[in-house]
A protein has these predicted regions:
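Active-site and NAD+-binding cores of ADP-ribose-processing enzymes
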Residues: 2-67, 97-216
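Extended catalytic/binding region for NAD+/ADP-ribose chemistry, centered on the ART fold
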Residues: 67-99
Length: 216
């Protein structure tokens, strides 16, 4: 059909402008890798009173989120983080558009050794055998299948580097391989007054709502 886009759908999905096949790849993969050096900073928002989470804890229950690689018979853990506060906020609250800072904490994490990540941004996703829309598809089962494939195929990687579906900033999903190489440099309640101005700016920049200020 000349002059028209042809939509390919293998299963119901909101990523309707591209075809996302399940793994394994239909072509030879030539993966790209991205290394975060020792001392690199990652930011993470978590709920300290939920499931006994700490600043550096990996979630064992799942699969739930986009790149969860959990499977029966394996001790799998996942930790999601961003390189910026804006990435963390939109990843956590982008779906609702309302920043809920109650009971949440912001952790500043440092890597105690280099972290090797599979590059899924830009052409990286195609080099890995999929497409960049993998990071934004509403079909979580499909993206989880790919994460399990990446985890099994590349035992040297600590996780994946992908683009946030909300603002395309760099986001990280770390596998349990990186569980003991993260150090919490600092953590603050998300409603801490020192974060207030920055959160308001990010909320405005992303057309999100921020909660009223609290006294901390």
């Amino acid at each position: 059909m000349q002059g028209n886009w042809i939509v390919f759908l293998q299963r119901p999905t909101l990523s309707a402008v591209v075809r996302i096949d399940p793994p394994p790849p239909r072509r030879d993969a030539r993966p790209l890798f991205h290394e975060l050096g020792t001392g690199s900073r990652l930011l993470r928002i978590y709920q300290s009173e939920r499931f006994g989470q700490t600043a550096t804890s990996f979630r064992r229950n799942g699969p739930l989120s986009r790149f969860d690689h959990h499977r029966d018979g394996l001790d799998c853990g996942i930790l999601y983080a961003g390189l910026t506060l804006s990435c963390c906020l939109v990843e956590c609250f982008g779906d609702t558009g309302v920043i809920d800072d109650q009971g949440r904490r912001l952790a500043f994490l440092q890597a105690t050794r280099p972290l090797l990540l599979l590059q899924l941004r830009g052409r990286g996703a195609m080099r890995a055998g999929s497409v960049a829309a993998l990071a934004s598809t509403a079909d979580r089962q499909l993206s989880q299948e790919w994460s399990r494939h990446f985890h099994a195929t590349y035992p040297q990687i600590d996780g994946v580097l992908y683009s946030s579906a909300h603002n395309e900033e760099a986001a990280v999903a770390l596998y349990e391989r990186a569980e003991h190489v993260l150090h919490c440099e600092m953590e603050l309640p998300l409603d801490h007054k020192s974060l207030r101005s920055r959160i308001l700016t990010i909320a405005s920049d992303h057309a999100m709502e921020a909660p009223p200020a609290t006294q901390r």
